[in-house]
Swiss-Prot record:
The lineage of its organism: Viruses, Riboviria, Orthornavirae, Negarnaviricota, Polyploviricotina. It catalyses: Hydrolysis of alpha-(2->3)-, alpha-(2->6)-, alpha-(2->8)- glycosidic linkages of terminal sialic acid residues in oligosaccharides, glycoproteins, glycolipids, colominic acid and synthetic substrates. This is Neuraminidase. It comes from Influenza B virus (strain B/Lee/1940). Belongs to the glycosyl hydrolase 34 family. Changing R374K: 80% loss of catalytic efficiency. Changing Y409F: Complete loss of enzymatic activity.
Length: 466
């Protein structure tokens, strides 16, 4: 809190005596909570002064005997952020397309970076568009290897949301082939994972300082979520996993405060394979995540993490609408909610975001239009219910990417308005040039706004042959 009283004492000395003037300012206070944000800037207070003139007949002269005392009040430290109710709306609409390679014509600093695994994270003042680059641009001469997931050149980069991730626009945060980031209300936390497959390392950066690390625990490609971590009251929660892409891979959550790990959380329940979780706040008490099982099922593992007890449990989503790719026909998996069903090896990160309302909650999901390939992207919603036990089909809201266009990873995030949060889903639209040329992505963003129906899909507008 600010000091309750600020006193400014101005002492004016004159040739005729001492004039003492005491000015006491009114108490300064501020209120900052989940739905109120007051922005302060440095305030300079100057005590009033008096100019005394002395004149004689022989030598007219003006003498200023006043003294001025200035005090600067520093702005209060920003407050931690908390989830708030979502802004009003009943449908998502196309908000933004970031298609860097529409500008891939000239080499140099203005050339777009070759990226993959984009995501967006937001603080109180701005959202940033993150991605993992191969330290190469298009056009350029370093296309070889840009289809690989892991190498020594990959870095976590970001630009302010709405800017094109070119060489000159991008901030390079750290070496990483897997990443995450989030804002706690005061500062950014950046997460990067790199290193050899059998001994990878989580690295944490808070603001400009590299602050902590976390070592591999299964020695099989330690990796993180490729979307935003989630902060409440200064505590940020990050999902990591370590294990085989075609077998067991048990996830953990790291509780991070001001860039330092203060607790690790080992989930219970259906823990065989959980990776690439997309997480958000269902309430001030619970973080929920829709994740990927690359090994056993096309159903999404669904995490509930209690931030009051720091405990987490995982079960499979029970809905008949299967969200992974590849996947069987909807409703074709027999048995209880925990039944895996048939699984073709592979999977994809899925978009997921909450719509928090006073009387109910909406959960929005994305999935590819194709059951077998990373093509197209649809948006689904389910109001209320429990994803662990509710077997009803999800409601199709609309098509964000047509089946003729690429639909790869997707993610969720929330933009902070003045008094509410705007839920959004982003889609990675990959230009897949194979092993012989560049391999990079555009990002489409859809956000909750207004009512009616989702009206228009997104195209990248990129011809790789040009």
């Amino acid at each position: 809190m600010l000091p309750s009283t600020v006193q400014t004492l101005t002492l004016l000395l004159t040739s005729g005596g001492v004039l003492l003037s005491l000015y006491v300012s009114a108490s300064l206070s501020y209120l900052l909570y989940s739905d109120v944000l007051l922005k302060f800037s440095s305030t300079k207070t100057t005590a009033p002064t008096m100019s005394l003139e002395c004149t004689n007949a022989s030598n007219a002269q003006t003498v200023n005997h006043s003294a001025t005392k200035e005090m600067t009040f520093p702005p209060p430290e920003p407050e931690w952020t908390y989830p708030r109710l979502s802004c009003q709306g009943s449908t998502f609409q196309k908000a933004l397309l970031i298609s860097p390679h529409r500008f891939g014509e000239i080499k140099g600093n203005s050339a777009p970076l070759i990226i993959r695994e984009p995501f967006v994270a937001c603080g109180p003042k701005e959202c940033r568009h993150f991605a993992l680059t191969h330290y190469a641009a298009q056009p350029g001469g370093y296309y070889n290897g840009t289809r690989k997931d892991r190498n020594k050149l990959r870095h976590l980069v970001s630009v302010k949301l709405g800017k094109i991730p070119t060489v000159e626009n991008s901030i390079f945060h750290m070496a990483a082939w897997s990443g995450s980031a989030c804002h706690d209300g005061r500062e950014w936390t950046y997460i990067g994972v790199d290193g050899p497959d059998n001994d990878a390392l989580v690295k944490i950066k808070y603001g400009e300082a590299y602050t902590d690390t976390y070592h591999s625990y299964a020695h099989n490609i330690l990796r993180t979520q490729e979307s935003a971590c989630n902060c409440i009251g200064g505590d940020c929660y990050l999902m990591i996993t370590d294990g085989s892409a075609s077998g067991i891979s048990k996830c953990r959550f790291l509780k991070i405060r001001e860039g330092r790990i203060i607790k690790e959380i080992l989930p219970t329940g259906r823990v065989e394979h959980t990776e690439e979780c997309t997480c958000g706040f269902a309430s001030n008490k619970t973080i929920e995540c829709a994740c990927r099982d690359n090994s056993y099922t096309a159903k999404r593992p669904f995490v509930k993490l209690n931030v009051e007890t720091d405990t987490a449990e995982i079960r499979l989503m029970c809905t008949k609408t299967y969200l992974d790719t590849p996947r069987p026909d909807d409703g074709s998996i027999a048995g209880p909610c925990e039944s895996n069903g048939d699984k073709w090896l592979g999977g994809i990160k899925g978009g997921f975001v909450h719509q928090r309302m006073a009387s109910k909650i909406g959960r929005w999901y994305s999935r590819t239009m194709s059951k077998t390939n990373r093509m197209g992207m649809e948006l689904y919603v389910k109001y209320d219910g429990d994803p662990w036990t509710d077997s009803d089909a999800l409601t199709l809201s609309g098509v964000m990417v047509s089946i003729e266009e690429p639909g790869w990873y997707s993610f969720g995030f929330e933009i902070k308005d003045k008094k509410c949060d705007v839920p959004c889903i982003g889609i990675e639209m990959v230009h897949d040039g194979g092993k012989d040329t560049w391999h990079s992505a555009a990002t489409a963003i859809y956000c909750l706004m207004g009512s009616g129906q989702l009206l228009w899909d997104t195209v990248t507008g990129v011809d790789m042959a040009l």
